[in-house]
Amino acid sequence: EIKKYCNESNLNFQPIDLRWGVSNEAQLDQKTLELCLEEVRESKINPHPNFLIMAGDRYGWIPLPYLIEKSEYEAIVTNIEKEEDKELLNIWYKLDENQIPASYILCERKNEFVEYLNWEKVENQLRDILQSSVNKTSLSKNDKEKYFMSATEHEVIEGIFKYLNTTPFQESILQQNKTLLQIDSENVYAYIRNIKSIDESYKNNFI
């Protein structure tokens, strides 16, 4: 129905599922989130409406930070109480002095951790360690948030909140509709619509 509606309006509807199509290599290199965010950035090239999210009640996967600046990482490690937790974190995060600024990078998955079920257990442990420790630091709220944000929330922020400048097309729409000009567009990040009257046979397709 969406594609039909767009065709009638001389628009091209091209849905992209950011959770499918990520290569095994990218997953093993811990680059999944960055690839998804890059896809969102690419969508901004188009002048017409380019970011639509249909969200359900699932918050989704919370990825580990791929990169943690050295000072931030050391502040976190200082607040880890158990030595085995420090050791686990230091096994998976390695200092890269070539980064500017120097940062700790999440290691790629190798050997038995190529198998997702094996990696999932370690990933959950690392996430718990980082989340519990970062809350004990004096880092800013913004710096702490990335340890708790789902991939979907990262994408929404990239697609909406980092795209606040009005495009020429949006400006033309505003000029055509004087009512919209009365809205404080600097504080309007999204329009939310609830889908009504979904056929019962399709409801199970939505998560």
Show the residue positions of the predicted features.
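Conserved catalytic or regulatory cores that recognize and/or transform ribose-phosphate-containing ligands
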Residues: 1-207
